[in-house]
Amino acid sequence: MNILLSHPTGNRNVREVMAALLRADYLAEFHTTVTADPHSRWIKVLPENFQKECLRRHYDIPKGKLKSHPYLELARLILPKLGMKSVADHEKGWASVDAVYKDFDRSVADRVKYLAKDEKIKAVYAYEDGALETFRRAKEYGLKCIYELPIAYWETSRKLLLEEAKRLPEWSITLGGGIHDSEQKLERKTGEMELADVVVCPGKFVSDSIPLSAKDKHVIISPFGSPLPHSLFAVKGEAGGDTKRPLRVLFAGSMGQRKGLGDLFEAIRHFSPKHVELVVMGSLLAPMEFYKKKLPHFRYEAGRPNDQVLALMQSCDIFCLPSIVEGRALVMQEAMSQGLPLIITANTGGEDLILHGQTGFLVPPGSPESISEKISWFLDHRNEIPIMGESARRHASMYTWEKYGNKISRELGGYLVEDDKLQLRKVRG
């Protein structure tokens, strides 16, 4: 039942899949780019900031199961800091994210060949943009290909983002690489989906985006877990019911129209700053002047360590994320865990987080009027915000990372067992 798992950077959901496969004794190897041992001497001589960056790449698994392919990723991390920014240019730089993914994919494919010859693995598990060569090699040896799609499939994403570029052309500069990807990159994504036997998705929005040509594939839907910070139960009490100050609406994420910020700005324009304060925390995708021209009186908060993010959340009343395209935005569950009701679109991937009128409200994507209407509702029902916040906190706590990983591991185990039985029946005729 051994599975080779690969991902260049090993984010939270990858780590939880890895842990679940390890618990089930399904993990053959985990491949990534950079790894770091906190006890290594070389770590301690690095500058503090880079030391922290490296230690994010520590993986708590047996050393024999951990394989790294670090060189191109190290170049991507280090050289731009030395002024060589062009080496990491989108799709063009020799140390770009795309170049790192392709190089990593080829390296993993070489390892698959070695393991498959000795029948040491049954399947490979890879992620969007880093799976094509791995899957091609796996197919040569009759291995199953598991594909995790963390965000809506590219055809759906591209269609929605191009529509946004037409609807709000001034915001198109914030839409990012999704509408500028080359044909070659899109062909890679298409090839990965075609070769996949199993597709893992974090929610209904992503699974619905799977193209018709791939609807026959085995699909596993497993929602991401909610953050469980030490301050989970430090809910902000009656703050939401305080009518003597403006209602504080929080947006968190990259500051672009993919996340619906243009629609939220338009909705906020309907309210006096005396009544509603918009707090925006995230990374700039355009100069600050662009945003201030659109909405002069919003409050900007830069990114910060997680404990400070939680403190900011507890100072707000509601969380709004009217996204156009997502996979499943973790920040929604983080906000809920701190007692904030939600105003979100189904396109955030968090439709299941909304118990209407209890944990928040769903609004249609691209509808500032609907956002404004729900903010007005909260203004008129401020005494209900603490109650809804508590409901949101309780509902978010039902989603755990352990459940996320265990569901994927359990369903993969069942799928591979059934496939073994099918192959045996074919042999017996």
Residue positions per predicted region:
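Short hydrophobic beta-strand element within catalytic cores of glycosyltransferases
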Residues: M332, P341-I344
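Aromatic "clamp/platform" in nucleotide-sugar-dependent glycosyltransferases that forms part
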Residues: I324
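Acceptor-binding helix/loop patch of EC 2.4 sugar-transfer enzymes
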Residues: I43-V45, R76-A95, Y141, C145-E187
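Conserved acidic donor-binding segment of nucleotide-sugar-dependent glycosyltransferases
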Residues: H356-G357, F361-S367, W377-R382
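Short alpha-helical donor nucleotide-sugar binding micro-motif in glycosyltransferases
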Residues: M193, A311-C316
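Conserved donor-binding/catalytic core segment of Leloir-type glycosyltransferases
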Residues: S226, G240-K259, F265-H270
